[in-house]
């Protein structure tokens, strides 16, 4: 199945784009997606520190991703 990935902040710089279509297996969870992204983009090795939102709602690692979902990869925010 196919999902849309949106990258924000440093994630955009690491991947080299701010959005892309991405294929995942049916019944994949957020943790499955993280493993796949690390495998395909070694620059995202610290993705476990990032927040993940699916269809504009923050998601836990065990959430099953549905076909056509919009998944945002949001790095930690720092500053003051």
Which ranges hold each PLM region?
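Ubiquitin-like/PB1-type beta-grasp interaction modules and other compact soluble beta-rich domains
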Residues: 1-78
